């Protein structure tokens, strides 16, 4: 009994071939071929702006664009008055833009007014004038400048005679400033005098130096200090190790004195020397000749002589070597190891006493001399020990007195040093000393201040005089305001000077300007912006008002169509970069999504692989009419090539006729007879026609052989019910079940529907409309499990076992079977008609007919032709 198994698209090939599949095809991502529009969201408040934007867009991008009205909007415009200057108007506009992002323009109101300056009369003193000017600025907000007024007057200094006491000078300066406010300074008056310093000779010892210093200061009246001239140092001696030979000791002493000036002596000492040697005895040697030979080898290889000794009365002997050195023992050890001989050794120590000499230096003062001795012995390679001698030399000092011009004190000092048996000297030098001082006031312009200074010093019994400094300055000053135009400012300045009892004059500058300005904002598109603008302007003490206006809005349309979402997104990004516009991307037509799978083969290699499994075709063949007897339809040549195309080519020969063979001629073309062979082997030229994907254009129905059956197309339930399943018996209105099944098991919706339509006879079969099995009504929409001997019984039995008790359950359950058995079979990975026919390994191919995939597309294509809303996914092979 034969079981009916559903095969993809109901295979109609001449024969089927199933083999194990292997391969390494690599799929890329999908390329979107849907059509999109890019719709900018920006609007323009005037038609002129929109028109200019379209023109610029077309120029910048080359895209076709247009604009159209897009509703209306209300705008607001604020105006404000009560502004007194252009700078104030600009400042308000700047603040308005910063605080609210509202921009606008300013313009003058009324006629121009003249600028004026206001000048004061004479003011005594520059300081007083600057004080009044600062007060003017503070109270009126009007700035100005101070300038000299009238003839220049000389600056004066007041200078005292010499004053001996510096403390008194400082007190007078402080008192002058306190009483008159006049600052002054003082300068020392210097004189040349001779001063003498006493210096003593060397004083040895700390206590003696301190004693002489105290006596000197007490008896001479001069202060003195002690300068350390020589630092006290320690004494050392050096004692050498044993020196062999008295002559060597004498010679070394002489060299020490010549080299360093250091003397010494030597003495005889006893020197004990311990010498270590070794006695070696070998292991046994058998026979006298053997031991003698060993002694000879030892002598030759180590240089050590030995003797032999018999072991008892045996024929064995040992080699004995006595009094050998450590170096000789090492040679013996190396040689014996090389010969693999054994030995024992023992150490022997011997002490001898001999006469030697030892040098001891005289006492050496200080580290410097001691280092010379150490360096000498080190150079002579004689070991010597340094020892402190237990005593030190005393420090040495020199007494130095303070400077004095009193010769009596100098004489006393010299006598005191001589009395203490010390040499002494007196050194005199000329020096400038300051013993009087002179006070000079700051430069004074006001004669009143000069008189105050003169009176002050005279009242303190100090001789004093005034003198010109050579500099002059004005004694009276005038204030002149900056140019002002506002009547309010003019009135404030005049009132200020009047209150301060200062006469003034007003002068026109010759310049004019506006004194009133107004501000007008741009059109505002929201109430929020309007309120923000009004609030800000009121805070600046101006009077704002506003008007409203209804405006037509304009919107730009980009009329270009973009293939693929990525291309549309790039266009949207370009608009953002060029103009700052945001855009929405709208799909206007579903297009195919195409991926390319690289088979890692050349097209030639693929065809050669397919030729090894004998691909079949029922297409016509061709033979040359020259060798056909058309009357009898027989071959006249001994051998006649049968070709797949009406031309001579090395790749289109598919067989041969012999002389006398009968042929069935079904047509003629350019000297070729078109014949019918039924199913036959295909030529490589015929195979390449179907294998090469470039032979099928994307807009032809045959492109559906690349349709990815493992990908849903996003169909509409309503559209499928209305256009595909209407009038299809039990399947009518079941689009949702098919679409749910497709989504659940990742299968193309129309692939499932086409199976169901074919298996159920467009929804009319008994299995599809429900059969009773074991008391339950069951449904089978794909004929799964139905044996040819009794398809209704076995199809119902299979449906019962699967629990398909509703049409929907049968549709969805059958989809699971189809998906796991065919579409998603991981062993073969054949989810397109092309892959089912043309495996990269030429194995597990669903048919031998080279046109199988080509012929299967008609039903799928016809169903999709009924629909509008879908997205198709294609997987197209790619050959090297």
UniProtKB/Swiss-Prot annotation:
Question: Under what conditions is it induced?
Answer: In stationary phase; under control of SigD.
* Residue ranges of sequence repeats: 439-473, 479-513
Intracellular or extracellular location(s): Secreted; Secreted, Cell wall
GO CC term (a single one): extracellular region
Q: What is its EC number?
A: 3.2.1.96
Q: Which reaction does it catalyse?
A: an N(4)-(oligosaccharide-(1->3)-[oligosaccharide-(1->6)]-beta-D-Man-(1->4)-beta-D-GlcNAc-(1->4)-alpha-D-GlcNAc)-L-asparaginyl-[protein] + H2O = an oligosaccharide-(1->3)-[oligosaccharide-(1->6)]-beta-D-Man-(1->4)-D-GlcNAc + N(4)-(N-acetyl-beta-D-glucosaminyl)-L-asparaginyl-[protein]
Kindly list the cysteine pairs connected by disulfide bridges: none
MF term (GO), any: mannosyl-glycoprotein endo-beta-N-acetylglucosaminidase activity
Biological processes, Gene Ontology terms? cell wall organization
InterPro entries cross-referenced by the UniProt entry? MGlyc_endo_b_GlcNAc-like_dom, SH3-like_bac-type, SPOR-like_dom
Would you indicate the residue range of the signal peptide? 1-27
- SPOR domain mapped to chain residues: 70-149, 150-229, 230-311
Result of knocking out the encoding gene? Cells lacking this gene show no motility changes on swarm plates; however in combination with an amidase deletion (lytC, AC Q02114) greatly reduced motility is seen.
One Pfam family named in its UniProt record: SH3_3
This protein's UniProt keywords: Cell wall, Cell wall biogenesis/degradation, Hydrolase, Repeat, Secreted, Signal
Q: What is the similarity comment for this entry?
A: Belongs to the glycosyl hydrolase 73 family.
Q: Briefly, what is this protein's role?
A: Cell wall hydrolase not involved in cell autolysis, competence, sporulation or germination. It hydrolyzes the beta-1,4 glycan bond between the N-acetylglucosaminyl and the N-acetylmuramoyl residues in the glycan chain.
Summarize subunit and interaction data from the UniProt record for this chain.
Homodimer.
* Listed name of the protein: Beta-N-acetylglucosaminidase
Q: What is the lineage of its organism?
A: Bacteria, Bacillati, Bacillota, Bacilli, Bacillales
């Amino acid at each position: 009994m034969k079981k009916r198994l559903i095969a993809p698209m109901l295979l109609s090939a001449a024969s089927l071939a199933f083999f194990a599949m292997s391969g390494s095809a690599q799929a890329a991502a999908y390329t979107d071929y849907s059509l999109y529009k890019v719709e900018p969201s920006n609007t323009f408040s005037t038609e002129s702006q929109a028109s200019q934007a379209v023109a610029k867009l077309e120029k910048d991008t080359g895209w076709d664009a247009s604009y159209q009205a897009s509703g209306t909007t209300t705008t607001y415009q604020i105006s404000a008055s009560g502004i007194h200057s252009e700078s104030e108007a600009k400042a308000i506009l700047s603040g308005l833009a910063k605080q609210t992002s509202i921009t606008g323009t300013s313009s003058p109101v009324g006629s121009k007014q003249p600028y004026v300056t206001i000048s004061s009369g004479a003011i005594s003193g520059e300081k007083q004038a600057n004080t009044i000017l600062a007060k003017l600025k503070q109270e009126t907000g009007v700035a100005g400048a101070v300038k000299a007024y009238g003839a220049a007057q000389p600056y004066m200094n007041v200078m005292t005679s010499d004053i001996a006491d510096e403390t008194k000078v400082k007190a007078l300066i402080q008192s002058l400033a306190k009483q008159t406010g006049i600052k002054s300074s003082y300068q020392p008056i210097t004189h040349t005098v001779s001063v003498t310093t006493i210096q003593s000779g060397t004083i040895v010892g700390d206590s003696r130096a301190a004693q002489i210093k105290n006596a000197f200061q007490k008896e001479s009246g001069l202060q003195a200090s002690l300068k350390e001239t020589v630092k006290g140092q320690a004494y050392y001696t050096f004692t050498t190790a044993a020196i062999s030979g008295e002559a060597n000791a004498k010679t070394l002493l002489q060299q020490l004195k010549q080299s360093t000036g250091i003397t010494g002596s030597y003495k005889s000492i006893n020197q004990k020397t311990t010498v270590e040697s070794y006695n070696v005895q070998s292991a046994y040697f058998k026979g006298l000749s053997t031991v003698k030979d060993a002694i000879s080898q030892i002598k030759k290889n180590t240089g050590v002589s030995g003797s032999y000794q018999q072991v008892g009365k045996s024929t064995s002997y040992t080699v004995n070597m006595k009094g050998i050195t450590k170096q000789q023992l090492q040679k013996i050890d190396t040689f014996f190891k090389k010969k693999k001989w054994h030995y024992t050794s023992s150490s022997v120590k011997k002490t001898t006493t001999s006469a030697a000499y030892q040098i001891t230096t005289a006492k050496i003062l200080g580290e410097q001399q001691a280092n010379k001795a150490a360096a000498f012995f080190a150079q002579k390679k004689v070991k010597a020990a340094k020892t402190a001698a237990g005593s030190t030399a005393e420090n040495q000092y020199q007494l130095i007195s303070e400077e004095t011009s009193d010769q009596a004190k100098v004489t006393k000092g010299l006598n005191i040093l001589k009395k203490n048996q010390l040499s002494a000297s007196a050194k005199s030098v000329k020096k400038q000393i300051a013993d009087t001082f002179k006070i000079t006031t700051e430069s004074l312009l006001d004669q009143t201040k000069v008189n105050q200074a003169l009176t002050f010093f005279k009242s303190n019994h100090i001789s004093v005089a005034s003198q010109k400094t050579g500099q002059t300055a004005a004694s009276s000053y005038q204030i002149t305001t900056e140019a002002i135009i506002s009547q309010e400012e003019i009135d404030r300045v005049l009132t200020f000077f009047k209150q301060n009892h200062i006469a003034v004059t007003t002068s026109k500058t010759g310049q004019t300007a506006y004194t009133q300005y107004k501000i007008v904002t741009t059109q505002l598109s929201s109430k929020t912006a309007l309120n923000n603008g009004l609030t800000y302007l009121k805070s600046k003490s101006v009077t704002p008002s506003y008007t409203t206006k209804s405006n037509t809005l304009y919107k730009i349309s980009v009329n270009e169509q973009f293939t693929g979402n990525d291309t549309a997104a790039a266009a949207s990004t370009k608009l953002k970069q060029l103009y700052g516009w945001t855009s929405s991307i709208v799909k206007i037509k579903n297009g195919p999504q195409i991926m390319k799978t690289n088979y890692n083969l050349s097209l030639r290699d693929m065809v050669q692989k397919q030729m090894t499994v004998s691909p079949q075709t029922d297409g016509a063949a061709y033979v040359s009419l020259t060798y056909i007897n058309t009357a009898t339809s027989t071959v006249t040549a001994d051998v006649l090539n049968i070709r797949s195309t009406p031309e001579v080519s090395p790749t289109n020969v598919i067989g041969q006729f012999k002389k006398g063979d009968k042929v069935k001629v079904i047509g003629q073309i350019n000297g070729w007879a078109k014949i019918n062979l039924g199913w036959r082997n295909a030529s490589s030229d015929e195979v390449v026609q179907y294998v090469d994907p470039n032979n099928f254009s994307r807009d032809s129905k045959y492109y559906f052989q690349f349709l990815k059956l493992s990908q849903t197309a996003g169909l509409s339930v309503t559209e499928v019910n209305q256009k595909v399943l209407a009038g299809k018996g039990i399947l009518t209105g079941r689009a949702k079940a098919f679409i749910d099944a497709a989504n659940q098991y990742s299968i193309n919706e129309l692939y499932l529907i086409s199976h169901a339509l074919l298996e159920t006879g467009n929804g009319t079969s008994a299995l599809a409309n429900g059969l009773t099995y074991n008391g339950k009504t069951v449904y089978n929409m794909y004929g799964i499990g139905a044996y040819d001997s009794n398809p209704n019984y076995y199809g119902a039995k299979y449906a019962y076992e699967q629990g398909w008790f509703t049409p929907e359950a049968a549709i969805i359950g059958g989809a699971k079977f189809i998906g796991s058995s065919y579409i998603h079979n991981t062993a073969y990975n054949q989810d397109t008609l092309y892959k089912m026919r043309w495996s990269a390994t030429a194995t597990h191919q669903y048919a031998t007919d080279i046109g199988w995939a080509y012929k299967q597309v008609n039903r799928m294509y016809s169903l999709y032709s009924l629909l509008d809303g879908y997205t198709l996914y294609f997987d197209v092979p790619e050959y090297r």
